[in-house]
């Protein structure tokens, strides 16, 4: 479930690439990627992002309106699988505003529809507790980059509900995106090392959000954790991560 500023016509390749990466990484936990299907749900009107009407991101109505449709879509996937005798693990991942939208949908979806729910860089959980989700106990997850993602929990609790990091009974996945080629060190070190004055000004203003879009980047521990859950596994252990990095020649 994508973020603010998402448009099917301009962002399709980005999400196709993300989907392929998530599929490929399931091989690290012994799953054949050819047995994995990934979907980017773009059938909702997302608030505009930077360069557009950014104030729309403060409006919860976009999430409220989209949540029932997402819930019905997920129920349709499950019903189709059941009708055709296909058993599958269904994992929903929501990023930023999309995680709040998905969270609201998970309170409405029929039980037995979704097996795992992951929120990353979340404005708010769309619920006050994991008990409100129609998700099996122990199968709700969150991922939060420690630096450069001030979006986490930014939405007011009265509308966006609890910051996922503070939800009881939630499983915390890795927030490590330092292996992303897009990862930046927030604060003075990064600004001092950029050589373009105008870029410096932009980075100072945007520093709190520099790493908000790095969760799904190829090679990150966050995206590997997501792939593990998709494959029905657990988050990446330190030993497994070391083995992956050795395989990649790091």
Predicted regions and their residues:
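Gly/Ala-rich beta-loop-alpha elbow adjacent to hydrolase catalytic centers
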Residues: 93-102
């Amino acid at each position: 479930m994508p973020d603010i500023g998402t448009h099917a016509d301009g962002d399709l390749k980005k999400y196709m690439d993300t989907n392929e990466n998530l599929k490929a990484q399931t091989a690290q936990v012994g799953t054949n990627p050819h047995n994995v299907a990934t979907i980017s749900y773009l059938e909702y009107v997302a608030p505009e992002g930077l360069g557009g009407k950014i104030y729309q991101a403060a409006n919860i109505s976009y999430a409220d309106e989209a949540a029932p449709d997402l819930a019905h879509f997920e129920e349709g996937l499950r019903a189709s699988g059941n009708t055709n005798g296909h058993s599958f693990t269904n994992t929903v991942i929501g990023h930023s505003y999309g995680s709040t939208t998905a969270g609201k949908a998970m309170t409405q979806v029929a039980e037995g529809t979704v097996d795992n729910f992951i929120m990353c860089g979340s404005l708010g959980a769309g619920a006050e507790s994991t008990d409100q989700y129609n998700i099996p106990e122990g199968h709700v997850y969150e991922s939060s980059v420690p630096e450069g993602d001030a979006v986490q929990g930014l939405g007011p609790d009265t509308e966006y509900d609890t910051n996922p990091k503070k939800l009881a009974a939630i499983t915390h996945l890795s927030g490590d995106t330092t292996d992303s080629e897009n990862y930046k060190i927030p604060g003075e070190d990064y600004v001092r090392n950029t050589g373009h004055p105008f870029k410096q000004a932009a980075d100072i203003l945007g520093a709190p959000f520099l790493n908000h879009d790095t969760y799904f980047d190829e090679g990150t521990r966050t995206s590997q954790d997501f792939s593990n859950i998709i494959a029905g596994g657990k988050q990446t252990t330190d030993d497994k991560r070391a083995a992956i990095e050795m395989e990649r020649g790091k």
